[in-house]
């Protein structure tokens, strides 16, 4: 599955 905004937020 493509990276979702939620996953991107976790990276920060």
Swiss-Prot record:
Keyword Amino-acid biosynthesis: no
Positions of modified residues (Phenylalanine amide): 12
Major localization class: secreted
Secreted found in the keyword field: yes
Localisation: Secreted
One GO BP: neuropeptide signaling pathway
Domain of life: Eukaryota
Family to which the UniProt record says this protein belongs: Belongs to the FARP (FMRFamide related peptide) family.
Protein name: FMRFamide-18
Phylogenetic placement of the source organism: Eukaryota, Metazoa, Ecdysozoa, Arthropoda, Hexapoda
């Amino acid at each position: 599955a493509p990276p979702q905004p939620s996953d991107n937020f976790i990276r920060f």
